């Protein structure tokens, strides 16, 4: 009852609070008017509350609850009215056209990191393939230059000369052998026919006991002594004379003397060495003249002149005539 009476009184008294049915009657008010209205309503409510409390103390508890409820309703109405009154009057502010942001300059390029001394080396970027290509190019250039040089110079490879062995020194011709002296028989036998002396000497077999052999030996001994130029001197005179010093021949003379000896070895018949008689072979003159030697001696001549023995040595007269020295005890 109390709440209805208050509502009726409020409505009859002509409250200035806007109702929900007439929102357009709401006047625009500033914040101060709203605050005054809220204060006036609160005062009226307080005064009415005090009157109700005084009139009916029994119903005080119920009135407190109703007051609270009314306060809530009034607060809700005020909030809705404030929203409705302010919403149409709010004019959006004109936004000024914003100038476009200034264009930013492009970022500077990134600088490469500082190089270390190892990166500055010339072979820093070289690889194995690059080295191989470079070496092949250098080899090709070298071969091309060599070919050009050979073509310009016109060098021609000479054909290899055949190898010639060194010529041996010419051999010296051996001196001709001296001719042996021609034998002349004491008797008037016919002389032998002219022919090569060596063939004659080989054809004539000399007997060991014949005087021809002795004469040939004597002549050979005499020729050797004459060639050497040494004179026979008695033994007594030899002792008084000083022995001449032998001069050593030079090497060239020795070689000259030894060469003819080597080239002319002396031939000795086997028959003379062994002492056997040499068998005579058939000769041409034997076939022509019936086997008789034209220069051979008869058996008579051999008996007359063959008394000398072949083995007996020839006695030298100078040794027999010289006085023999008596051997003393070494005293003068």
Curated annotation (Swiss-Prot):
Residues 1-125, 159-332 are annotated as: Disordered. Residues 66-76, 239-256, 283-307 have a biased composition (Basic and acidic residues). It is found in: Sarcoplasmic reticulum membrane; Endoplasmic reticulum membrane. The keyword Cell cycle does not apply. The keyword Transport does not apply. Residues 221-232 have a biased composition (Low complexity). Specifically expressed in skeletal muscle. Detected in skeletal muscle and tongue (at protein level). InterPro entries: JSRP1. GO terms for biological process: protein localization to membrane; skeletal muscle contraction. Residues 98-116, 177-197 have a biased composition (Pro residues). The modification Phosphothreonine is found at residue 51. Disulfide bonds: none annotated. Residues 1-80 are annotated as: Mediates interaction with CACNA1S. The modification Phosphoserine is found at residues 223, 228. Keywords: Endoplasmic reticulum, Membrane, Phosphoprotein, Sarcoplasmic reticulum. GO terms for cellular component: sarcoplasmic reticulum; sarcoplasmic reticulum membrane. Interacts with CACNA1S, CACNB1 and calsequestrin. PANTHER family: JUNCTIONAL SARCOPLASMIC RETICULUM PROTEIN 1. This is Junctional sarcoplasmic reticulum protein 1. It comes from Mus musculus.
């Amino acid at each position: 009852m109390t709440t209805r009476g208050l509502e009726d009184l409020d409505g009859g008294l002509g409250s200035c609070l806007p109702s929900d049915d007439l929102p357009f009657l709401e006047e625009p008010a500033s914040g101060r008017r709203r605050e005054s209205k809220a204060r006036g309503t609160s005062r009226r409510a307080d005064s009415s509350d005090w009157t109700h409390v005084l009139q009916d103390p029994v119903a005080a508890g119920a009135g407190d609850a109703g007051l609270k409820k009314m306060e809530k309703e009034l607060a809700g109405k005020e909030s809705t009215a404030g929203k409705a009154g302010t919403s149409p009057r709010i004019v959006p502010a004109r936004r000024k056209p914003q100038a476009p942001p200034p264009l930013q300059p492009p970022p500077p390029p990134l600088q490469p990191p500082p190089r270390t001394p190892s990166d500055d080396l010339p072979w820093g970027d070289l690889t194995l393939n690059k080295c191989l290509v470079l070496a092949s190019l250098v080899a090709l250039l070298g071969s091309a230059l060599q070919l050009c040089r050979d073509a310009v110079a016109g060098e021609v490879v000479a054909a290899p000369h055949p190898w010639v062995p060194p010529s041996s020194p010419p051999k010296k011709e051996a001196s001709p052998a001296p001719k042996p002296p021609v034998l002349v028989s004491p008797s008037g036998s016919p002389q032998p026919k002219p022919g090569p002396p060596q063939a004659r000497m080989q054809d004539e077999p000399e007997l060991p006991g014949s005087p021809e052999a002795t004469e040939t030996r004597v002549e050979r001994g005499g020729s050797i002594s004459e060639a050497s130029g040494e004179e026979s001197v008695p033994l007594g005179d030899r002792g008084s004379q000083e022995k001449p010093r032998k001069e050593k021949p030079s090497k060239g003379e020795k070689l000259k003397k030894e060469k003819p000896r080597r080239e002319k070895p002396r031939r000795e018949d086997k028959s003379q060495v062994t002492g056997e008689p040499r068998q005579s072979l058939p000769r041409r003159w034997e076939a022509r003249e019936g086997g008789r030697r034209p220069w051979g001696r008869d058996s008579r001549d051999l008996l007359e002149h063959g008394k000398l023995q072949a083995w007996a040595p020839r006695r030298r007269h100078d040794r027999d005539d010289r006085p023999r020295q008596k051997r003393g005890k070494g005293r003068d």
